[in-house]
Amino acid sequence: MNKLDLPLCLSVIATIASAQSIDVPITQFKLDNGLNVILHEDHSLPTVSVNVWYHVGSGSEKPGRTGFAHLFEHILFEGSKHVPEGKFDRWLEEAGARNNGSTTEDRTNYFEDLPSNALELALFLESDRMGYLLDVVTPEHVDGQRDVVKNERRQRIENQPYARIRVALPGLLYPSDHPYSWSVIGSMEDLSAATDEDVKEFFREFYGPNNASLVVAGDIQTDEARKLIEHWFSDVPRGREPPKNTFPEVSLSKEKRVFFQDRVQLPMIHMAWLSPPIFADGDADLDMLASILSDGKNSRLYRRLIYEMEAAQTVVAYQ
């Protein structure tokens, strides 16, 4: 029997990652500068998680100005007015914390997981880079992190097997002027062309407290946590009112097929469909479908394509 070793990847592209609705007791309030705050007490462990969500991602960018949201994910770790360069991670590490950041089409997130007695440290660090980052950002900072992002793109895309399809796929599903049509990491050309002032202007437009949510969950006393948050964040100046993203409805009128030549041993088939926005009718159904199709070795596609047909080595379905 002829055997074709074929990695197969199926995907359903949604506007943002899906989530389940869970009944969690919270306290929610808003500071005068517009910062949205959500608190949740959970005393099962002596730890706390601090998350800052900026309501900006690659979907807020413009053609010719791609990659700015992801670039700022890096720049925000380079120090701020009251946090010397290199000390942000150092102070958190000394406190026993784990921290990182991530960027998607619709949001940028920074988090710290740390012992609950170090909560104030995380709040101070996050408030300082929210309000006083541009005081210390220099062209050298921008150039340095621009090079880091370019190297990240080379590692994850240019030098990664099968990665070209991840960059090409959004452009096949969305019109060229739609902000979901380009990758979160941006293009090399746009990153190279961005000036120091271009990058700073993007921060001024989107990174104020009135365009952010602060979530603190874990071993906290709600009243005490609220006082700390008000102390560190109330003086952060309100930012501009950012423009609201309004995306036209997208549909595909016909099937599109694209073939890539790559230096890989095995071919890959990647099939994608547009799916409903988060929480819309059909969103949860497709999450369940993806799980049924490919989660685990007893899933339907895994059994059919790998065990029975011996046509693939890997199969993945996701929304």
Describe the predicted segments one by one.
Residues 21-54:
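Mature N-terminal segment immediately following signal peptide/propeptide cleavage
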Residues 5-15:
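Bacterial N-terminal signal peptides
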